[in-house]
From Swiss-Prot:
List of residues binding beta-D-fructose 1,6-bisphosphate: T428, K429, S430, G431, R432, S433, W478, R485, R512, P513, G514, S515, G516, F517
Record-annotated membrane-spanning stretches: none
Gene, per the UniProt record: pkm
Natural source organism: Xenopus laevis
Binding-site residues for substrate, renumbered to this chain: R69, K266, G291, D292, T324
Catalytic activity of the protein: pyruvate + ATP = phosphoenolpyruvate + ADP + H(+)
Protein name: Pyruvate kinase PKM
GO biological process, one term: cellular response to insulin stimulus
Subunit-structure text: Homotetramer.
Swiss-Prot/TrEMBL site (Transition state stabilizer) positions: K266
Top-level taxon of the source organism: Eukaryota
Protein residues bound to K(+): N71, S73, D109, T110
Xref: PROSITE patterns: PYRUVATE_KINASE
Protein family membership: Belongs to the pyruvate kinase family.
Amino acid sequence: MSEAGSAFIQTQQLHAAMADTFLEHMCRLDIDSEPIVARNTGIICTIGPASRSVEMLKEMIKSGMNIARLNFSHGTHEYHAGTIKNVREATESLASNPIHYRPVAVALDTKGPEIRTGLIKGSGTAEVELKKGATMRITLDDAFQENCDENVLWVDYKNLTKVVKPGSKIYVDDGLISLLVKEIGPDFCVTEIENGGMLGSKKGVNLPGAAVDLPAVSSKDIQDLQFGVEQDVDMVFASFIRKAADVHEVREVLGEKGKNIKIISKIENHEGVRRFDEILEASDGIMVARGDLGIEIPAEKVFLAQKMMIGRCNRAGKPVICATQMLESMIKKPRPTRAEGSDVANAVLDGADCIMLSGETAKGDYPLEAVRMQHAIAREAEAAIFHRQLFEELRRVSPLTRDPTEATAVGAVEASFKCSSGAIIVLTKSGRSAHLLSRYRPRAPIISVTRNGQTARQAHLYRGIFPVLYREAVHEAWAEDVDSRVNFAMDIGKARGFFKSGDVVIVLTGWRPGSGFTNTMRVVPVP
């Protein structure tokens, strides 16, 4: 052990990671143990007024942002095109410095099949107070579309009276206002206000338990997705996915030109949780969208859904994102609550590939502090994972295979634990070799070298992959080309402090040029 102990890379909670039981693992965690240098979890930031400028985006990239999320529930196409341009400008401005350069991905978050209320007294900014116990009439009569008040509220979902029944709940504005349905007419229902408050215009409506039959992809979504293809976004976060057919519909809209865009399905209601397996099968990844989920299912059950979804994604080897309210209090305060710190750490311990910030970076007062805080918590949590048990279980559930790349990936991760390697270096074109390594959750960062920009950007969705973009011309001698890419990864790893001369790294390469031939693993001392 003394020899492995001198490899400074792996001191991070190593004693705990190799315990025999989970209880023993917890007993051995040590607050004075230094976390790993690399952070393995991806950080997704929503870009909005607080973070749109090139200057701010540069700082966010330096602080650790990997994926920029654009929320298409708000803003025009011009606005989002400007944001995308700024993100790319900020990313490329750091390209001259290969150490700081990170290929940042762009994600388009669709509005999805939302139900919204009408305008209060004809104005977008007016508010009325709803009093507990009062009666509120919900109407589908378009005469009230721009003329709602404390007595009558118009909603834009025409089948409302068919899907709710007396005793149903209707939630408005993220669950802040709740209404209890008393009686139902042909184009209206009478409700009692259970929870009052100030109601503004065009607020979101949730109908927990109702079988809402809205199209998965609205006409606005179709325009937004086509815009995304033109803008060359890397991934789509598809809102309110309820079944596999919804995912296929999004794929169809993306079409041939957008066939390489990753589709991450957002699970936000009971039906989505119930039909999780078919959705996972059809998607490239999953987002646990805890905001709407916490209204659609009881708040005390959200953590169960989170653990179940993360577990099934880890088992299937697909990326999973934990989102909503992770550091919510940092919208207004420079430090998170203790509960939020715990929440971020536990999402990482559960096995999330990425953690997301919404309002914290889009409209908050402390966007940079929020990114740095997530980065710091994630590093500590990653060191505290019970790697010994996790690797054995992941290896056990992975199907038997004759695919050389899969077999090599398992071997490489096992070897990386055995020799406490500073990193696993992999050369990849499509990204698949790196994704397979990520699936087995090595402690060491996976430095994935590729010439394909999109492969590099999408790799941020997977835990532990540190993508680097290799921009030199292809060498005519293939073996020389392999060596120059491996050396490039070594230089970056040393400059970033992942390892130093004399440490060992594991190198995965193919036996011939092209995609799909990765089958050679070498254990190499760092020069």
